[in-house]
Swiss-Prot record:
Divalent metal cations. Prefers magnesium or manganese. The gene is maeA. Its cofactor is Mg(2+); Mn(2+). GO terms for molecular function: malate dehydrogenase (decarboxylating) (NAD+) activity; metal ion binding; NAD binding; oxaloacetate decarboxylase activity. GO terms for biological process: malate metabolic process. It comes from Shewanella baltica (strain OS155 / ATCC BAA-1091). A divalent metal cation binds at residues 243-244, 267. The record marks 267 as: Important for activity. This is NAD-dependent malic enzyme.
Length: 562
């Protein structure tokens, strides 16, 4: 119990307290609190500390035989006692993060309606489009500072999950709190239910969402606009994170709102920021600079192109021209290398397409220029996979890359693990342990020739909690590109491999609080420099970060009335 903070004054008592997850303490209510709040007999006699509760909960957690059951168990604790939930996760962050988020959350999304137990967050359905403000008013959280919102159309690599996508905002906000210290009282997960095009869901009698094909076009755009306006009117200072929107909507929504409201898209910008931060760390470990790299991408969707644009921006900041930087980045998708004469390039792909004149001197390539063709002709030093298709980083491709690059940087980032382009074990064996590897999903350490290699997880959780904390602490009105670039550089500064020459490429999850605070300071400092918030000194910003950092400790309660 944190006795250094002032007590909270509660206007209600009895069973209602035990049903409020933000204030419930369960068996940790003191004798005085049990008397004053009419709780005697409603909980067992013994008065326990939060650590004793967490120990019991951990034993129960370990008793489950599969990850989905563990996920459901943790969600049940979260829905009954949030402070205990976050203490449990904090104590076991490396073990539990894959359970509360990727990869287990994907299965939880697929089975959302079948496993539904208790409400959390808000479902805003298209038939209720004229009552959005009323729905926002129904939220159990009224001091909302961070919203994660999805429409469920592109959940991880699993496609359209309808309202089952709610598992993603819930899981993401759990990481905002457990990694970034954002009080759960300030977070709100939202799912925009605009129908589903998943026939299995439409035919499933247990599906709980709006049984209707997805809306699109002007109807969809007007619904998103109504939602954004309603949120801004009710909570004008709230940070909105867009999550798992389909490629056709993700970039247009971001472009439409990023300069109007405080918002960002984690799939595009967060993924890009953590990838660039990891690349900066890998380059430092390899004794080189990012602007010297030749980079090949497999996957040219919004996430891949977002990473590529962030890399180009960082290269330019290191002293080369935008035009030169773009010649060093090759994007390969299902149709082969993106070229400027292709007729069906998406708007966000056009600036990343290679000029046909740049490949005139290439040799031995097919009509649709493959990744292997790119590797053989450009001799890349960096290979990034965001294709969502397993096994595409073949032994031939990796060995060809290693033949011209002593320490290749290889990031198979697709989620979940079943969709990774190549496993770290294969990559390290094919390169005799010389590759610098980071993945999008968690992998066990790999042993090559008696040496153990820890696999860095290029996980957005290293970035977005720090961005959120920095925005809240600084009061930034927008999330600028410069703030995102600052988050990448701050992450690279925390790399054990870059700092000491040994250890993993990215910090351990056990150090995530320090990493998030470091990123928050970098993000907040840029917000101040860009005039996106009120002027403040570095000292005041640091104090604000510490003051906004919530810890899972019980507070003392006092009763306001009888």
């Amino acid at each position: 119990m944190d006795d250094n903070k002032r007590p909270l004054y509660l206007p209600f008592a009895g069973p209602a307290i035990l049903e409020a997850p933000l204030i419930n303490k369960g068996s940790a209510f003191s004798e005085e609190e049990r008397i004053f709040f009419n709780l005697e007999g409603l909980v067992p006699y013994a008065i326990e500390t939060i650590e004793e509760q967490a120990s019991r909960a951990y034993d129960q957690f370990r008793s489950f035989n599969n990850d989905l059951d563990k996920h459901i168990y943790l969600r049940n604790i979260q829905d009954t006692n949030e402070t205990l939930f976050y203490r449990l996760v904090q104590n076991n962050i490396s073990e539990m993060m894959p359970i509360i988020y990727t990869p287990t959350v994907g299965l939880a999304c697929e089975r959302f309606s079948k496993n539904y137990r208790r409400n959390r967050g808000l479902f805003i359905s298209y038939p209720n489009k004229d009552r959005i403000d009323d729905i926002l008013n129904n939220s159990t959280r009224q001091k909302v500072k961070i919203i994660v919102v999805t429409d469920g159309e592109r959940i991880l690599g699993l496609g359209d999950q309808g309202i089952g996508g709610m598992g993603i905002p819930i899981g993401k906000l759990s990481l905002y709190t457990s990694c970034g210290g954002i009080s759960p009282a300030y977070t709100l997960p939202i799912t925009l239910d605009v129908g589903t095009d998943n026939p299995q869901l439409l035919e499933d009698p247990m599906y709980m969402g709006w049984r209707h094909p997805r809306i699109g076009g002007e109807e969809y755009a007007e619904f998103i606009e109504a939602f954004m306006q309603a949120v801004h009117v009710r909570w004008p200072d709230t940070l909105i994170q867009f999550e798992d929107f389909a490629q056709k909507n993700a970039m247009p929504i971001l472009e439409r709102y990023k300069d109007r409201y405080c918002c960002f898209n984690d799939d595009i910008q967060g993924t890009a920021a953590v990838a660039v931060g990891s690349l900066l760390a890998a380059c430092k470990a390899a004794g080189t600079e990012l602007n010297q790299q030749r980079i090949a991408f497999l996957g040219a969707g919004s996430a891949g192109c977002g990473i590529a644009e962030a890399i180009v921006a960082q290269m330019v900041s290191e002293g080369i021209s935008d035009e030169q930087a773009r010649t060093q980045v090759c994007m390969v998708d299902r149709w082969g290398l993106l070229l400027d004469n292709m007729p069906n390039l998406l708007p966000f792909q056009q600036k990343l397409a290679q000029k046909c004149t740049n490949i005139q001197n290439w040799s031995n390539f097919s009509d649709n220029i493959s990744l292997l063709d790119v590797v053989n002709n450009t001799k890349p030093t960096v290979l990034i996979g965001v294709s969502g298709v397993p096994g595409l980083f073949t032994e031939e491709i990796i060995r060809a890359m290693h033949s011209h690059c002593a320490r290749p940087i290889i990031f198979p980032l697709s989620n979940p693990t079943s969709r990774v382009e190549a496993t770290p074990k294969d990559i390290l064996h094919w390169t005799s342990g010389q590759a610098l590897v980071a993945t999008g999903s968690p992998f066990e350490p790999v042993v090559v020739d008696g040496e153990t290699y820890e696999i860095a997880q290029c996980n957005n959780s290293f970035i977005f909690p720090g961005i959120g904390l920095g925005v809240l602490a600084s009061g930034a009105r927008h999330v600028s590109d410069a703030m995102l670039m600052a988050s990448s550089r701050a992450l690279a500064e925390c790399s054990p491999l870059a700092i000491d020459g040994s250890g993993p490429l990215l910090p351990k999850l056990e150090d995530i609080h320090a990493v998030s605070k470091h990123i928050a300071f970098a993000v907040g400092k840029v917000a101040v420099e860009q005039g996106l918030t009120l002027p403040m000194s570095d000292e005041i910003l640091q104090q604000s970060i510490e003051g906004n950092f919530w810890s899972p400790e019980y507070r003392r309660y006092k009763r306001t009335s009888f």
